Amino acid sequence: MEVGIFVNFQKERSSEILENIVSIFNQNGVNWLLVNEENKKTKNFDLLITIGGDGTLLNVVEKASKEATPVLAINCGRLGYLTEEVGDDIEKAIFNLLKKEYFIEERHIVEAKVKEKVFFALNDVCIVRNTFNIVDLCLYIDGVFAQEYRSDGIIVATATGSTAYSLSAGGPIVEPQLGVILVTPICPHSLSSRSLVLGSARTIKVENSSSENVQVVVDGRFVDELAPEEFVECKISQHNLKLIRLKQRNFYEILREKIKE
């Protein structure tokens, strides 16, 4: 078995958890490698482990989904929507992993095409202003003009991303198993501008109809700029993210705890 481990060393206890995992792997003949930005595109693994928070998991979304590699995301901080809470039972968790005593939870992701480059987002693709000026963005659904937004930007989110930036911008909460696309304007200059919830077969195009450039941000990471009349095209990907679950998790219990924070 080949295991890749991606660690956010800024998180409390991340080094301690890594040491425990590596010790168990070494004792059981498991090949492992620390994954970083330099080697994650060239190395293939049977499974991936992330140690950190939900944000740490986002670093391996593209690799894991394209290669159908299951991911065990171990939480080191506050309660996460996506990560596993193992607490002090890290040894038990890893032995259950080795014995394959787990199940797979699949999450839909968005595939975004920007100038012939393709990016993958577990949470969202954001088209946002580059300056303090508001921007004009045109939304097309399956090639049909739907609406023009004067706003600070637009969030194109998955069901998983409905509890992230989209929620802060006033978007709805959607059960993560649903293969829908959410379109949420950011601070729109119109009381009639509302979020849209679209089916999984829809293709969305967001065109920059402003006189200045806008930024494209994928899962919190800047990837490119759109000049006037350039666009980003988004759809639900044929690839899913496979999350390893060691125990049953109730979405609404997690949601209740997160909202209380």
Swiss-Prot record:
Its EC number is 2.7.1.23. It is found in: Cytoplasm. It catalyses: NAD(+) + ATP = ADP + NADP(+) + H(+). The keyword NAD applies. Its main location: cytoplasm. The active site is at D54. GO terms for molecular function: ATP binding; metal ion binding; NAD binding; NAD+ kinase activity. NAD(+) binds at D54, G55, N123, D124, R150, D152, T163, A164, Y165, S166, L167, S168. Its cofactor is a divalent metal cation. GO terms for biological process: NAD metabolic process; NADP biosynthetic process. One of its GO terms (cellular component) is cytoplasm. Keywords: ATP-binding, Cytoplasm, Kinase, NAD, NADP, Nucleotide-binding, Transferase. Gene3D superfamilies: Probable inorganic polyphosphate/atp-NAD kinase, domain 1, Probable inorganic polyphosphate/atp-NAD kinase, domain 2. It holds the Pfam family NAD_kinase_C. Belongs to the NAD kinase family. HAMAP family: NAD_kinase (MF_00361). Involved in the regulation of the intracellular balance of NAD and NADP, and is a key enzyme in the biosynthesis of NADP. Catalyzes specifically the phosphorylation on 2'-hydroxyl of the adenosine moiety of NAD to yield NADP. This is NAD kinase. It comes from Caldicellulosiruptor bescii (strain ATCC BAA-1888 / DSM 6725 / KCTC 15123 / Z-1320). The gene is nadK.
